[in-house]
Amino acid sequence: TTFRALTDNDRGAGHAFERAQWAVAGKYARCVDTKVEPLGETAVSVTYTYELAIAQRTKVTIRYVADVLGHVDLHVAYPGEKDGDLPTIPAFGIEWMLPVEYSNLRFYGVGPEETYADRKHAKLGIWDTNAFRDRAPYLLPQETGNHEDVRWAEITDDSGHGLRVSQTANTETGVTKPFAMSLLPYSSTMLEEALHQDELPEPKHMFLRVLAAQMGVGGDDSWMSPVHEQYQLPADQPLNLDVALDLF
């Protein structure tokens, strides 16, 4: 995904017009190459190359390294696009649809409330929440529920079974970075398309977003001021998401 549901601040600052192309860039990206490599006798690497639906056709790679025990390392890379004057990116990462029963979230990051690049007012710790509690019922549905500086997160059903997502090292730099994430009963697209809360349907799935980064939410005012420059994501700079996935 390269998009987030617009906030009231985004609309007031004109971000909808400026960043409209990012709403479709990831949603309609097309796979242009697949590469499968055995890694010895116990693991395999599968790399998908996607072409973003923008004029520059920037290529993003998604690499899965899976072993026979079910452990998966996921590496998602955006190289930065210096051709053309692209607007800054709202968000970059992966959004998955999960069965509706996987609504519980435990994470090690800053919380327990939602946090953003320019709203890190919370404490670092291990927090328990759920997809329904994390969704703020704004009059106009919008971006909500993000958690920053996450080291690991566990998404579970009421029986305690689920998925663990944890930070891992980048294969090229060796650097390990925290990630941003959210678990909500609605996708970014569903939140963006609804004009009122009662237009959101009864939840049938959960939506897990795991992001390399997301721009800030601003708030100097809600009718003109943009997100401060240091909390935006320049399109000409690379972005990398590196996480490990384990079922339990």
Label each PLM-derived region with a short phrase.
Residues 1-248:
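Beta-strand/loop-rich accessory regions of lumenal/periplasmic or secreted enzymes
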